[in-house]
Amino acid sequence: MASPTEISVNQLSRLIGTPDCPRIIDVRIADDFDADPRLIPSAARHSHTDIATLTADLQGQRVVVSCAKGLKLSQGSAAILRDLGVIAETLEGGHVGWVKSELPLVPVAKIPARNNAGRTVWVTRQRPKIDRIACPWLIRRFVDPNAQFLFVAPSQVENVAQYFDATPFDIEGVFWSHQNEKCSFDTFLDEFGLHSDALDRLAKIVRGADTN
């Protein structure tokens, strides 16, 4: 049974992708992370030794801290945050518990490098249609809640990507775009391992509206 400062895997999974999803912080040590370099959707990785430095950014938000098994690292980190005025819980069973429940996990290698502010930066064509609206929604809800999106003239997408260290998407000739009959939203689902009944249904709607 979860303690008053724990949240179960099932409870957290129901919040993922919703406006009520807490900020999720992964504090696994390097060996545990290297053994499974994937994150719970929307999670960000930080060292337990630096947890207090996150306080200002986390004030007023609900936080869930996860380590390998939900023991010393997450419980100690969450306790520090609570002492500093942050509403913080730990994930019961930690990363291992999430994996055992066979829930989606995002491969870190697929996430673009973050800027100095800790945000991924993406760029695409201005005047977005459904695919270029759905993709930012997906990224902010399931990959990087603080992601930055730049909408520029079509002819300047790749130039902006180069000069602003942004990742281009939904244009011809780039990785994060249409693949055969699939739209860009499908590519994000595939690469980030985010398939679920709900997101697959949404992908069908996006694909139908985008390719007709």
Place the predicted regions along the sequence by residue:
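Rhodanese-like catalytic fold shared by cysteine-dependent sulfurtransferases
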Residues: 1-23, 27-64, 69-130, 135-136, ...
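A short beta-strand-loop structural module common to alpha/beta enzyme folds
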Residues: 27, 148-158
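An accessory alpha-helical subdomain
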Residues: 201-212
